[in-house]
From Swiss-Prot:
Recorded catalytic activity of this chain's protein: a ribonucleoside 5'-triphosphate + H2O = a ribonucleoside 5'-phosphate + diphosphate + H(+); a 2'-deoxyribonucleoside 5'-triphosphate + H2O = a 2'-deoxyribonucleoside 5'-phosphate + diphosphate + H(+)
Cofactor section: a divalent metal cation
Gene3D superfamilies tied to this protein: 3.90.950.10
Protein name (record): Nucleoside triphosphate pyrophosphatase
Domain of life: Bacteria
Stated family: Belongs to the Maf family.
Length: 204
């Protein structure tokens, strides 16, 4: 059984569309405690900490009965957009989102998603989660943006969508029409590489 250690609605929808049985529980890990400067490594470390935080507190969570038997997988993910060597998280306000889009217009950047899958067994009697394997990887996709006029950028920013997305855009949302092409894993840009998950899920 799979637990998605994330509050992300886009990751939730990806799993639902693939008909993967799971439950979603936010890990509530404080991301500001990680000081890693390498963007590629930062995405991976954050994904691990999210999954690990949930695994350490799983005894305090009320799980469905079917989660008490057999293997249990905890999936942590974190996405960071890299533009010319700079990490772009979620814009703090509309002004910042507009400035970023002015820079990204007609250019390309990289969406890095760190993935961590913690595999183990949960004993409902002892309330102990025994880890048997940890699988980690950062998957990167190159994203090309259309050349936009200022009014187009403003129109998009005014939807508020950029304020809730790593990099300030959502491929599966309104922002999708401003993306020319993607090199690499498509679903990775939405926060979860489905090919990576297929290769590693249920290995136990």
């Amino acid at each position: 059984m799979l637990i998605l250690a994330s509050a992300s609605q886009s990751r939730k929808k990806l799993l639902e569309n693939c008909q993967i049985e799971f439950i979603q529980i936010s890990s509530n890990f404080d991301e500001t405690t990680i000081q890693e400067k390498n963007i590629f490594n930062l995405a991976l470390e954050l994904s691990f900490q999210k999954a690990n935080s949930l695994s350490e507190n799983i005894q305090n969570i009320s799980l469905p009965e079917e989660f008490n038997y057999g293997p249990l997988e905890i999936l942590g993910c974190d996405s960071i957009f890299e533009f010319k060597g700079e990490a772009y998280g979620k814009p703090s306000n509309k002004e910042e989102a507009f400035i970023r889009w002015k820079k990204m217009s007609g250019e390309f950047g990289f969406l890095h998603t760190g993935h961590t899958l913690i595999i183990g067994h949960f004993d409902s009697t002892s309330k102990i989660f025994k880890i048997t394997e940890i699988i980690k990887k950062t998957v990167s996709s190159r994203v090309y943006f259309s050349k936009l006029e200022d009014w187009e950028i403003k129109s998009y920013v005014d939807t508020n969508e950029p304020l809730y997305c790593a990099g300030g855009f959502a491929l599966e949302g309104i922002g999708g029409k401003y993306i020319e092409k993607i090199e690499g894993c498509f679903s990775n840009v939405m926060g979860l590489s489905l090919p990576w998950l297929r290769e590693n899920l249920y290995r136990s």
